[in-house]
């Protein structure tokens, strides 16, 4: 006699389990700015001396940039949240596709490579799929500085052909205040011959942080954070030690977490004027926000009402907080409208929020939101970094349990997120186990069929 038993196992990728509806309390610690850290790490290529960068968050994007620098010949030593970079022996001018395709900030290396080695080759970079983010402005800026640049088969090839292998100062006007283009031109022009001006540059705090470190290395950068940046080229740059500014996007996410869970919280360290637009909108929708000590903010949410926002470059409302703010508006009293003006594909969270009971209608890049009393836990998935953060906030406030997949996105930009939220009172945990009953994961589950166990009996 024999019998055959078939076991079917549904295997879910690493995910977060969130038991929603719990208030938060205490302090949420803000890490160093990811976007600033990436540019600062690339800037280490500009000097032959050692550079120490402190308050660097431990993220997958930072790991990718670290591997890129090692591939170019730099030596890195990491201790907790500090990175020492020695670029004295860089020799490789070509960045590998397998690293570049996942990190848009990899393009920051082009300017330093041109100034140090006179040449750079890089595949067109990747990053979050949130719409077209061409590097045209970066390339035009490098060309204005005297570099010869061509794009062949999606590979950017740049070189300096002057006798002394130095770029030449120029007057550059950006069509759009691109952060990446501003940082690329800023780094490339520090060692250029002569004076460079950037009109209509990005004014983000990360630009100011980069300029501050470059100046401590011996560069001559003036006007960062204003509508015109002036750079006087120098012969060489020295090493330095620099502490990264707090991450304003993480801080904003935490402020919104307090609001959506209707929980008083202390957030910090922060630089308040980096968050002016966000603080203004949170106050408008019903939150009390005040300075708490020298480097923290205290937020006390009251009844949350719908308010309209439109994203724009700094000092406007940041596009990186559009998705988290939409989660808040989904549970606000009344209606609201959110218009995305920076990226055209940054509404991937709408479908997931509606799955949780939100009432959001999307028309092109404008979301029309009718607030509901509460969201309901569900199986949800993040499609990019900031939409993932928005969905996690929704899960925290929702009634019932949620399962979130998309950790690869969260780990790019939020350091130890579940640990921080758990310390503040949330019930959120990272899981790697198998799940057998969540059918709505159909597009993510790997089914193992035909696992047969045969038992033979005489």
From Swiss-Prot:
Metabolic or biological pathway, per its Swiss-Prot or TrEMBL entry: Cell wall biogenesis; peptidoglycan biosynthesis
Pfam family, one: EPSP_synthase
One cellular component term from this protein's GO annotations in UniProt: cytoplasm
GO biological process: cell division; cell wall organization; peptidoglycan biosynthetic process; regulation of cell shape; UDP-N-acetylgalactosamine biosynthetic process
A GO molecular function held by the record: UDP-N-acetylglucosamine 1-carboxyvinyltransferase activity
Alphabetical keyword list: Cell cycle, Cell division, Cell shape, Cell wall biogenesis/degradation, Cytoplasm, Peptidoglycan synthesis, Pyruvate, Transferase
E.C. number: 2.5.1.7
Family statement: Belongs to the EPSP synthase family. MurA subfamily.
Role noted for this protein: Cell wall formation. Adds enolpyruvyl to UDP-N-acetylglucosamine.
Name of the featured protein: UDP-N-acetylglucosamine 1-carboxyvinyltransferase
Gene behind the chain: murA
